[in-house]
Amino acid sequence: MTRSASATAGLTDAEVAQRVAEGKSNDIPERVTRTVGQIVRANVFTRINAILGVLLLIVLATGSLINGMFGLLIIANSVIGMVQEIRAKQTLDKLAIIGQAKPLVRRQSGTRTRSTNEVVLDDIIELGPGDQVVVDGEVVEEENLEIDESLLTGEADPIAKDAGDTVMSGSFVVSGAGAYRATKVGSEAYAAKLAAEASKFTLVKSELRNGINRILQFITYLLVPAGLLTIYTQLFTTHVGWRESVLRMVGALVPMVPEGLVLMTSIAFAVGVVRLGQRQCLVQELPAIEGLARVDVVCADKTGTLTESGMRVCEVEELDGAGRQESVADVLAALAAADARPNASMQAIAEAFHSPPGWVVAANAPFKSATKWSGVSFRDHGNWVIGAPDVLLDPASVAARQAERIGAQGLRVLLLAAGSVAVDHAQAPGQVTPVALVVLEQKVRPDARETLDYFAVQNVSVKVISGDNAVSVGAVADRLGLHGEAMDARALPTGREELADTLDSYTSFGRVRPDQKRAIVHALQSHGHTVAMTGDGVNDVLALKDADIGVAMGSGSPASRAVAQIVLLNNRFATLPHVVGEGRRVIGNIERVANLFLTKTVYSVLLALLVGIECLIAIPLRRDPLLFPFQPIHVTIAAWFTIGIPAFILSLAPNNERAYPGFVRRVMTSAVPFGLVIGVATFVTYLAAYQGRYASWQEQEQASTAALITLLMTALWVLAVIARPYQWWRLALVLASGLAYVVIFSLPLAREKFLLDASNLATTSIALAVGVVGAATIEAMWWIRSRMLGVKPRVWR
């Protein structure tokens, strides 16, 4: 084992205590996430819950419990959001920036495993195969030590480390053993510096969420005048008693609030999370499902995303004139079996040639970075070496030129040769006889090609970026069907506009630094692209955080998993199309659901305004002011089968239609005209059926029932057009909703509990006639709207 002069038995307990007191310990700042209390407050104290909560208290004050059924929505809205966010928080909190590595720390008091936060400056940390480097340091002992820094730099090849070399936190040992002295701890360590920029809690962009918030804000402005007018007219002009006035007032205000829209959106996202969870895909922010469906550029990190860790033997090219009695396959299998600490290349050879001949080893020479070869002397089977062709061969030889030609294609080439002396001889390997060229390539994920083909069909462009050399990146991209010249990122322009223009001309980029990955994301976003970034290393963290959607591999660095919105726990790139599919389902279905809820809001506001204006006009004209037609129970049952249950089913249904921008415009061009028709039709029926404030209780109930019949007919027709294009289950849903109301009106107990009376044939006939006219108007509007938006109207799929 090579030791540096600085290798020691480690720190004393007093030296450790002194460094802790001086703040020179490995305290890593925790990632900032919302606390449980903040999550609860954010989901309970919402604008909608506040409005509904006040109205619920008012209704309960009247003693009418059945009219307070809408209060259940407050609980449902809050619980679903809290459960999902707390679940994501718990997952995030488990993903520490440096991970749960337990380094083996050597001190004068003894050598034992310790937590990463126990490490202090100048500690001696021992390393073996698979160990993670938890802090930056300097190698003080090494025995054929090779470090994989791909999570930090993107460079796929393991790096041989000698005494005095630097090792960085976030890398890990591939082969060999050694020890290093901690030179940078805590926030000074390389991985911690990158992670610090990704430590703040952020929310992914969401057109659905932003659009719904804009709509809710607009509705709030409408609620104020409509609500004040309703409160005044129902409490101070109708003179029917405070309980009846309060119930009518609440009956007017409750349906104005699209309370179920937020609930159904949360449910649709939550179900998407569960479905993707079954595919080993962790969604850490609900709207990330939607975001990936809108992505038009995917920046895919090569190492760890498109390729797997390790190498694969793709070809063994035997050289002319290398006649030996031993077969090349037997020699390679014997070499692999004799290597106690195989590096990535020898592991690939062992996988390809897994039937060793059982030769007896006479001498063994492990791989060293200084010599670039390893070898074994076998009893009765000669001396064999394998290593870099440019070291073992004459550069002018045919074999050397052949190896150079293959290497120029982005492949790794090793020379298998017979040596003239034993491998442990001072002059080893002596004169070598070339026998074969062993060609290795990075393992491409078996599902990567299929996934990239899917994105191509969906008009999503893919940019392959890596810290590896450009030739290697280009070779992998070419194997995956992404043809074109690869660019060395060291030649990329620094200006955002120039960089964006360059990105349009190239598909693959090598030698990309972490800050350049972030700059690439920013440049693409500046040209209006929605960018997804996939990666698994600490070097990907900054780009993952700033991309519209960050996707990390489950086997990647804890830092990359912590900042990504989506984590592929099974490391399968092919999971992404399923995420896109879930996003499309959410977007398409929530758009349908939003049409239903906002139509209800429009007709509720309009009906309240019409009744309120009539009350104001009636006072100077000495006419009876109108009571609002509905009590809270009426609007509750009206929502059951025209909105609530159908919306729930529609929000979960399969839907693979492409996502397009313009959510608010499309929804409002349906909801506003449909809502106006329903509001006017309901008001006309009620006006015709209303018998005045001195009417009997039965007559008032008949007028309210007539208005409800018209509302149900027109609202059901809105459901019928929103559910198009029909499939058998959508048509069945519409028919079942209509049948449910027929059953309610047919059952005496239901009529009694829900305050319904359709026994007056005159008012009921008026309600039916106006309902038919309203439904026909909605049908005509649907056809006209489709033409105006340039969409072909389809009744059947």
Curated annotation (Swiss-Prot):
A molecular function GO annotation: metal ion binding
Main location: membrane
Topology within the bilayer: Multi-pass membrane protein
Binding site for Mg(2+): D301, T303, D536
Keyword DNA-binding: no
Protein localization: Cell membrane
One GO cellular component term: plasma membrane
Class of the enzyme per the UniProt entry, highest EC level: translocase
EC code: 7.2.2.10
Pfam families given in the database record: E1-E2_ATPase, Hydrolase
Transmembrane parts of this sequence: 55-75, 215-235, 254-274, 601-621, 633-653, 667-687, 703-723, 729-749, 764-784
Superkingdom to which the source organism belongs: Bacteria
Family named by the database record: Belongs to the cation transport ATPase (P-type) (TC 3.A.3) family.
Family matches, as NCBIfam families: ATPase_P-type
Job of this protein: P-type ATPase involved in specific uptake of calcium.
Protein name: Calcium-transporting ATPase CtpE
Gene: ctpE
